Amino acid sequence: LETGGTGPKVRPVVACKGTTCQYGLIDTVAFSRTIHERFYKGWHDVRLPHKFKIAVGGCPNNCVKPDLNDLGVIGQRVPSHDLSKCRGCKVCQIEKACPIGASRLGESRLDWNEEMCNHCGRCVGKCPFGVVGEEKRGYAVYIGGRWGKRTAQGRMLAHVFTSEEEVLEVIERALTLFRDEGSAGE
């Protein structure tokens, strides 16, 4: 990757170490290189209303803060739950594995708060009775983040994308919309 980039253009892509980390769910290095080639280099001569920053994080731990960039990508491992298999163990491995408390043992079985779940996937396969499996792996895309004097967390699109091509298309559309409709300094 090349360093540098100034002015109202796509900036160099930032990424965490991805799959070389124990929590990495996607190959951030390879994917950020693809994004870099297509948008940093490919859009190098395209003037935008303001700089445009892109970050790729391998998991929901948010180490490189993708949600605080104009566009951020975060690896996802969406769990599937079959709560009918839950036996209400008093030593629930799913509850122990969940770093944010989205899964808790209730009076008789596991309670899963889907709204709270960040799709880190640490609970997948932890239950010996097969309560939690993997529904899909993919990418969450955040748009509209900002870092600096005025910080704003980007909004996650309401869909977990399952291929890099889908994400690249979202980036292309976001950049095209920003180029055509964005305001200077926005």
Predicted regions and their residues:
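Small-residue-enriched alpha-helical segments and adjacent helix-cap loops
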Residues: L1-V91, D111, M116-N118
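A hydrophobic, small-residue-rich beta->alpha segment in the mid-to-C-terminal subdomain
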Residues: R137, G145-G185
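Predominant activation on well-ordered alpha-helical scaffold segments within soluble catalytic domains
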Residues: V29, R33-H36, E95, L168-L175
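Iron-sulfur cluster-binding cysteine motifs and their immediate structural context
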Residues: V91-W112, R122-G138
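Short, well-structured alpha-helical interface segments that form or flank functional binding sites
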Residues: L68, R122, E169
